[in-house]
Design a protein with these regions (language model features):
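N-terminal hydrophobic targeting signals that begin at the initiator methionine
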Residues: 1-5
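Acidic, metal/ion-coordinating pockets
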Residues: 7-372
């Protein structure tokens, strides 16, 4: 009996200690505090709901959609001369070949613009009186979309190398390949996420005039262009220096509303200038250049202009990104495959010096003894 009483007493004492400990714990820490700690822990460990995730992704997409990138590359001669089939033989029908080292870059942007200096035609007996005339089969126009090129200007001195038939055949080949194009003193509009982008192409024998430029820009603005690009063919072959026409017309175009001036013809890189709120690319040099098997100046670049929304519906050029390249991926003989230079190399820095206007090398005497 005493043993039973001792056991009962021990049980009662133990229960009393437990109850007393609980009361003291509540008084010391409080139930509210314990609840808040629990709630916070739960909030930190909870996975975001699908609705929250969707909202965050939508917000990120809206932020990203406020920026667009347009890439500019230089002369693309995707053909061989009448005297040498080197380019055609190297490509051998592989449309991905010329831009294999840069296609990923050009396809990752929003739009890419190039200067096209060749004829696409399958016409039998089509010959040119010109020494520097380049022609490829019509299906070689497919190289452009395969490499990420979205638009080409044909406003240059090679437009009529094979006369009317060559010009017509080239236009048809580009249309079949799905590549928009414009010739001398012509305009083009395209839509980019609701914004109209206008392009004006002009050669006029290396001398775009104020009247031509103003008329074209006004026309594009009237058609709703919120961003205007002027593609001019001008300058002196082989020269790193600007002509008076380049300097004057570039500035005039900007003053009339051009946001980017894109130059070609010198076959070498010339400086980039920020004028007012616009970007002037005086010359982008050669890019994939089938016109020469061993060009002496192999420097080129991909220049990317970043567009952002400005006041109202207008877009503005907010940044410029430069990717220095070599027009060939091999030393010596041109393989026609432009490739980015490694950052920090002498070649990389040399491209930057040409584009920032500090390059001090002599002008080239253009030599076409190695016509492709």
């Amino acid at each position: 009996m005493k043993t039973v009483l001792r056991v009962i007493s021990m049980i009662v004492l133990t229960l009393g200690i437990i109850v007393l400990g609980y009361i003291m714990c509540v008084r010391l820490f409080g139930v509210d505090t314990a609840s808040r700690l629990f709630e916070v822990t739960m909030q930190e460990s909870e996975e975001p709901s699908s609705a929250d995730t969707a909202a965050e992704e939508e917000e990120a997409e809206e932020t990203e959609a406020l920026h667009w990138t347009i890439s500019f590359v230089g002369d693309c001669t995707l053909a061989s001369s009448q005297y040498n089939n080197d380019f055609i033989n190297k490509v051998n029908g592989d449309y991905n070949y010329p831009f294999k080292n840069v296609a990923d870059i050009l396809k990752a942007d929003d739009y890419t613009i190039a200067n096209l200096e060749c004829t696409f035609s399958d016409r039998v007996g089509l010959v040119s009186d010109g020494t520097f005339a380049f022609k490829a089969p019509s299906d070689y126009a497919r190289i452009l979309p395969a490499g990420g090129i979205d638009f080409v200007t044909t406003a240059n001195n090679h437009r009529d190398d094979f006369a009317d038939n060559g010009r017509v055949d080239t236009d048809v080949a580009l249309d079949i390949a799905g590549v928009p194009h414009r010739g001398d003193n012509e305009t083009y509009l395209f839509n980019m996420d609701g914004h109209k982008i206008g392009i004006y192409c002009c050669y006029n024998h290396l001398s775009p005039t104020e009247e031509m430029v103003k008329t074209a820009i006004d026309q594009l603005k009237e058609q709703g262009a919120s961003f205007v690009i002027c593609a001019f063919h001008w300058g002196v072959e082989g020269s790193y220096q600007l002509t008076e026409v380049q300097d004057h017309i570039a500035h005039y175009a900007v003053e009339q509303g051009a946001d980017v001036v894109f130059g070609s013809h010198p076959h070498v890189l010339q400086k980039i200038e920020k004028y007012e709120d616009s970007v002037i690319l005086y010359s982008m040099g050669n890019f994939s250049f089938g016109g020469n098997t061993s060009p002496r100046d192999r420097d080129t670049a991909i220049v990317q202009v970043v567009l952002t929304e400005g006041e109202g519906t207008d877009l503005v050029a907010s940044d410029v990104q430069i990717i220095p390249c070599c027009l060939s991926s091999t030393d010596g003989v041109n393989d026609y495959c432009p490739k980015p230079y490694a950052k920090g190399t002498a070649e990389y820095d040399r491209v930057l010096s040409k584009l920032n206007g500090t390059f001090e090398g002599p002008d080239l005497t253009v030599d076409y003894s190695n016509i492709g």
